[in-house]
Amino acid sequence: MYMIVVKYLYALCSSFFDCILNFNETVFGPSHRAFNPNNIIFIVDFQNFNILDSNMLVSHMTRHLSSWQYPTWVLVLTIRTTVSMHNRCTMRCSQTLESIPFHHTSKTFAFAD
């Protein structure tokens, strides 16, 4: 029992100091999030198994799945029949995509029983 308490207190202290050292880690971009897969801290709370890491010092940031890694480097210029995307790099380039109009589409049909 004593070893479990010591391991739990060590995990709490290490997560506290890790939180202090990486306080502004999520500011730099969407790829830097609080739940970093390279540095995962596992803490088991025997009093409450339903809450993931019930330590108030460790934040759990939400993240959108389709967020871009460098959102300031991509700029969409026009969205009409052609979509021009301007990619801000060291070498400037633009990519143009043409949307296909549906002039000769067939009629919709219903499935019969």
Curated annotation (Swiss-Prot):
Subcellular localization is given as: Cytoplasm; Nucleus
Superkingdom to which the source organism belongs: Eukaryota
Q: What is its main location?
A: cytoplasm
Sorted UniProt keywords: Cytoplasm, Nucleus
A GO-annotated cellular component? cytoplasm
- Please report the name of this protein according to its UniProt entry: Uncharacterized protein YGR219W
Task: Provide the species name.
Answer: Saccharomyces cerevisiae (strain ATCC 204508 / S288c)
